[in-house]
Amino acid sequence: MPDYSAQPKKIFLYDNLELVKYYPYYKRTLPWYQDPTLCRQVDNREEPYDLARLKRMYRFLSTNGECYYIKFRDHGRWHLVGDISLCRGAVSIVICREYQNRGIGRRAISGILRRAGELGWRQVKAEIYSFNDQSRKAFLAAGFRQTGKETFVYGF
């Protein structure tokens, strides 16, 4: 099992994109998970998260793997626009709706794959609902291949 205690505080990806080690910032992240459309993309249900559920999710991801915020520079200012995690052989990602369809997800996925390689992972899985076309496209563009109806795998 990888040693997650050595998780870097930042992973620089591009001049306008970096991954930042998770820290509690629910004022920013709770609105993402209260968006019914985004909840459907993530969990296939439109039920928004409450604060307790959000805390449980982040606690699980950050103690069983590596969890990062996706930080994007837009018009000269840095913004947290989503999160991405490596946990139990899989990657998961959320981009808030106002920053979707800008290539941020694809680039963040490529960056987290580099991190998985550093950790010695041989493959990374992603479960993506069949209706989530934009996420499927991002994972395929990052080099994943579809191995099941909703299963995608990246091999090193």
Report each predicted region and the residues it spans.
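Conserved beta-strand-loop-alpha-helix junction that forms the acyl-donor binding cleft
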Residues: 126-137
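A short, well-structured alpha-helix characteristic of acyl/acetyltransferase catalytic modules
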Residues: 1-56
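Conserved beta-strand in the GNAT
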Residues: 69, 77-90
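Long, contiguous binding/interaction regions
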Residues: 83-87, 100, 138, 151
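Active-site rim helix/loop that mediates acceptor-substrate recognition in acyltransferases
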Residues: 46-66, 73-74
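Conserved catalytic-core motifs of GNAT/GCN5-like acyltransferases
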Residues: 89, 127-128, 145-156
